[in-house]
């Protein structure tokens, strides 16, 4: 499907963004729409970039991403995402999709749309939740059953920390988004 020109659509107006910056278009749209649908149209192959939204080493097709205004305003990388790729935004009126994707979006780890492969930038909505220490308490019965050595405890902590790597989170979030949009 060929990429179209980038438009901003709102209940009141429809503007073409070739003459107005995308940030200005978004500010105009935010005042009239409660929920925006973003359709990213990157200009290059993602073999040179990293993104939550698309797998690496593939050319990107149209992709709609539902975000609330509150989520957008909390992300510092949105403006740089907008500059690096074209996007379309329009209000969404499908309440079923809206509620399902709002739940997914609230737990997503965001990246900039275009970040150098060597130094990807990850944005986490609530870092306090992920940076909390992991504690494992074990009881040592008198007969020695269910005893965990210090090596076992350290291995369990390291395994849980490995599960929170940016690469694994990015892959898991991409898969969830693609599955939810496929339904």
UniProtKB/Swiss-Prot annotation:
Pfam families registered for this protein in UniProt: Gemini_C4
Entry keywords, A to Z: Host-virus interaction, Inhibition of host innate immune response by virus, Suppressor of RNA silencing, Viral immunoevasion
GO biological process assignments: symbiont-mediated suppression of host innate immune response
Function: Pathogenicity determinant. May act as a suppressor of RNA-mediated gene silencing, also known as post-transcriptional gene silencing (PTGS), a mechanism of plant viral defense that limits the accumulation of viral RNAs.
Family: Belongs to the geminiviridae protein AC4/C4 family.
Protein's name in the database: Protein AC4
């Amino acid at each position: 499907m060929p990429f179209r020109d980038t438009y901003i659509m709102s209940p009141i107006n429809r503007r073409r963004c070739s003459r107005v910056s995308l940030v200005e278009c978004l500010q105009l749209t935010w005042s009239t729409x409660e929920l925006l649908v973003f359709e990213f149209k990157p200009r290059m192959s993602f073999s040179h970039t990293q993104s939550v939204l698309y797998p690496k080493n593939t050319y990107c097709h149209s992709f709609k991403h539902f975000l609330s205004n509150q989520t957008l305003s909390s992300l510092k990388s949105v403006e740089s995402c907008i500059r690096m790729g074209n996007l379309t935004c329009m209000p969404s009126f499908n309440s079923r999709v809206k509620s399902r994707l709002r739940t997914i979006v609230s737990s997503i780890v965001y990246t900039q749309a275009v970040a150098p492969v060597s130094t990807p930038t990850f944005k986490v909505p609530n870092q306090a939740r992920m940076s909390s220490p992991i504690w494992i308490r074990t009881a040592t019965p008198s007969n020695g059953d269910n005893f965990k050595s210090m090596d076992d405890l350290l291995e369990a902590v390291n395994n849980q920390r490995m599960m929170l790597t940016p690469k694994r989170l990015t892959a898991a979030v991409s898969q969830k988004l693609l599955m939810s949009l496929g339904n």
